[in-house]
Amino acid sequence: MTNIRKTHPLMKIINSSFIDLPAPSNISAWWNFGSLLGICLILQILTGLFLAMHYTSDTTTAFSSVTHICRDVNYGWIIRYLHANGASMFFICLYMHVGRGLYYGSYTFTETWNIGIILLFTVMATAFMGYVLPWGQMSFWGATVITNLLSAIPYIGTDLVQWIWGGFSVDKATLTRFFAFHFILPFVVSALAAVHLLFLHETGSNNPSGIVSDSDKIPFHPYYTIKDILGALLLILVLMLLVLFSPDLLGDPDNYTPANPLSTPPHIKPEWYFLFAYAILRSIPNKLGGVLALVLSILILAIVPLLHTSKQRGMMFRPISQCLFWLLVADLLTLTWIGGQPVEHPYITIGQLASILYFMILLVLMPIASIIENNILKW
């Protein structure tokens, strides 16, 4: 009798992707984040679906409907906080996943890497629009400030902003369309994630050594399924600790005040996971320059494969590049801290230096370090 797992049209796709998939025998816990991102996405879609059943996307009732979910809906509070903190876990996993790709040279799979960048942009857009929905002070002013950045685009900027707003300010039309987009985009993300996996399975996974592992493969199940389950349990543990003990730790207190167009909060800032990009945006005095730097801070990932000058794939045996990589991580943490601070001395200078260093490491220092390491190999 033939195994249904290997013959059924649907089952054989699942089988070749998650069961009999040949995987390198030495991939570390850094390779867990792909599956964790999948779990985060499923969690966000499910909790979001239940929230959407009770949420109303109208400026007069949006804030009240979120309060109603927390107070009157059965387990509404936990669904709401799972969704809010689930987004934070999503971004932690995303940044770890991208960091792993940079460290181990996974970006040499250019198709997979480029789809990943598109995924990152899509998830960021989804999260931004989701932050607007509770219609608190930071929701309203965050939406106003970030959408207003598009007015820096020459000639069409102002018209573009008013088109996105659906009027002359962030109002009912804006909230309704943001809700519609926030609902549909996670499904777009799911489709892109499938394409991401499709491209990955064309080449097979990278591994910590960066050496081709075709001669040493093991089946995905049971070895990596059990490893992924362990990762998932740890993710759920951290998420539940956040949700049940300090659900508002990563949020902004200003968002518990209903949106008021007549009162600007003293410090407008996005959620913590956008602070590094926000700091780069603010570090350039010119509006258009700031917007370009903001976009380039993520888009720079697309040219990383072109700047790969090393003879080795990963950084496992490249000490100079390792130092630069961890300097980049420290720099991003500094930018995240600066993004949450008011625009005053010394934060302005620190932010500008950190922004310059960010682009310097990726564009100049890492390619030079790779060339030096190549020459050291000849000794």
Swiss-Prot record:
Heme b b562 binds at residues 83, 182. It is found in: Mitochondrion inner membrane. One of its GO terms (cellular component) is mitochondrial inner membrane. A ubiquinone binds at residue 201. GO terms for biological process: mitochondrial electron transport, ubiquinol to cytochrome c. Keywords: Electron transport, Heme, Iron, Membrane, Metal-binding, Mitochondrion, Mitochondrion inner membrane, Respiratory chain, Transmembrane, Transmembrane helix, Transport, Ubiquinone. This is Cytochrome b. It comes from Phoca fasciata (Ribbon seal). The gene is MT-CYB.
